[in-house]
Amino acid sequence: MIQKNWQELIKPNKVDFTSSGRTKATLVAEPLERGFGLTLGNALRRVLLSSLRGAAVTAVQIDGVLHEFSSIPGVREDVTDIVLNIKEIAIKMDGDDSKRMVVRKQGPGVVTAGDIQTVGDIEILNPNHVICTLDEGAEIRMEFTVNNGKGYVPAERNRSEDAPIGLIPVDSLYSPVKKVSYKVENTREGQVLDYDKLTMSIETDGSVTGEDAIAFAARILQDQLSVFVNFDEPQKEAEEEAVTELAFNPALLKKVDELELSVRSANCLKNDNIVYIGDLIQKTEAEMLRTPNFGRKSLNEIKEVLASMGLHLGMEVPSWPPENIEDLAKRYEDQY
């Protein structure tokens, strides 16, 4: 059936986010099919850096300045350096309409992003960011134009034909994501060792959390890829939808290598061809102790783990093992 092309691919059963403040986060997703770590990591990284919307300054007007190659008396930085500093102001703004914000300050002192007077729906996220430095007696007034957008827009595209004299266009860095890196490692799922583990590190400007940024990027990819799906989702047959009534505890379908056992105990079970918990609990203590390299310490460890699950050695399971044990294990894996 065609749905097996995607339904039988393994999906991550572990997706963990670790945040460090509002600007940094790390995502760990595992297991993934071999090669999917690189595929998803690269796709998410590209979308995170290029396609998420944010706010940025698009133009600035400085009193007494006609163009960006000017200098201002009493201001240590020239206008070109001031414009470069303005590009780095991190802004969060609601709505799509263009907004204005103003800063006016007298020297001596440092003009920072926190000195900017904003309207209610604009928030400065890096108020300590330095814009320029004023000497004694110097004064500066700047008016900024702020817009929402995505990606990077060069200053030339922000220059309008009807712009007043002295309005200096600014390169706009709209993306709220500043850095993204990822790595792919091998990970284990059951007895298979060659699945992928994807780790992504993301740094934002604070207007969006790392976790939300990844969620938005994934949604963009989902929407873009949906246009290539040229068929309706096949309906599952009734017998596939019906859940088999088990005659035993679903926990018996869990594989013993998923238990938190010592290496010695796990190897002994593997060498004795004990794959599922259902295989294990039917063994008696005497049978276990006859297993090569299996001692009293390993026995006590296994008894303790089974007891935590309400199980013990020497149990009888008349219908064990079921004929379709692998299918049942997949079907009931979310119940143990």
UniProtKB/Swiss-Prot annotation:
<keyword id="KW-0808">Transferase</keyword>
<keyword id="KW-0804">Transcription</keyword>
<dbReference type="GO" id="GO:0003899">
    <property type="term" value="F:DNA-directed RNA polymerase activity"/>
</dbReference>
<dbReference type="Pfam" id="PF01000">
    <property type="entry name" value="RNA_pol_A_bac"/>
</dbReference>
<dbReference type="GO" id="GO:0005737">
    <property type="term" value="C:cytoplasm"/>
</dbReference>
<dbReference type="InterPro" id="IPR011773">
    <property type="entry name" value="DNA-dir_RpoA"/>
</dbReference>
<dbReference type="InterPro" id="IPR036643">
    <property type="entry name" value="RNApol_insert_sf"/>
</dbReference>
<comment type="function">
    <text>DNA-dependent RNA polymerase catalyzes the transcription of DNA into RNA using the four ribonucleoside triphosphates as substrates.</text>
</comment>
<dbReference type="GO" id="GO:0003677">
    <property type="term" value="F:DNA binding"/>
</dbReference>
<dbReference type="InterPro" id="IPR011260">
    <property type="entry name" value="RNAP_asu_C"/>
</dbReference>
<comment type="similarity">
    <text>Belongs to the RNA polymerase alpha chain family.</text>
</comment>
<dbReference type="GO" id="GO:0006351">
    <property type="term" value="P:DNA-templated transcription"/>
</dbReference>
<feature type="region of interest" description="Alpha C-terminal domain (alpha-CTD)">
    <location>
        <begin position="248"/>
        <end position="336"/>
    </location>
</feature>
<keyword id="KW-0548">Nucleotidyltransferase</keyword>
<dbReference type="Pfam" id="PF01193">
    <property type="entry name" value="RNA_pol_L"/>
</dbReference>
<feature type="region of interest" description="Alpha N-terminal domain (alpha-NTD)">
    <location>
        <begin position="1"/>
        <end position="232"/>
    </location>
</feature>
<keyword id="KW-0240">DNA-directed RNA polymerase</keyword>
<dbReference type="Pfam" id="PF03118">
    <property type="entry name" value="RNA_pol_A_CTD"/>
</dbReference>
<comment type="subunit">
    <text>Homodimer. The RNAP catalytic core consists of 2 alpha, 1 beta, 1 beta' and 1 omega subunit. When a sigma factor is associated with the core the holoenzyme is formed, which can initiate transcription.</text>
</comment>
<dbReference type="GO" id="GO:0046983">
    <property type="term" value="F:protein dimerization activity"/>
</dbReference>
<dbReference type="InterPro" id="IPR036603">
    <property type="entry name" value="RBP11-like"/>
</dbReference>
<dbReference type="GO" id="GO:0000428">
    <property type="term" value="C:DNA-directed RNA polymerase complex"/>
</dbReference>
<protein>
    <recommendedName>
        <fullName>DNA-directed RNA polymerase subunit alpha</fullName>
        <ecNumber>2.7.7.6</ecNumber>
    </recommendedName>
</protein>
<dbReference type="InterPro" id="IPR011263">
    <property type="entry name" value="DNA-dir_RNA_pol_RpoA/D/Rpb3"/>
</dbReference>
<dbReference type="InterPro" id="IPR011262">
    <property type="entry name" value="DNA-dir_RNA_pol_insert"/>
</dbReference>
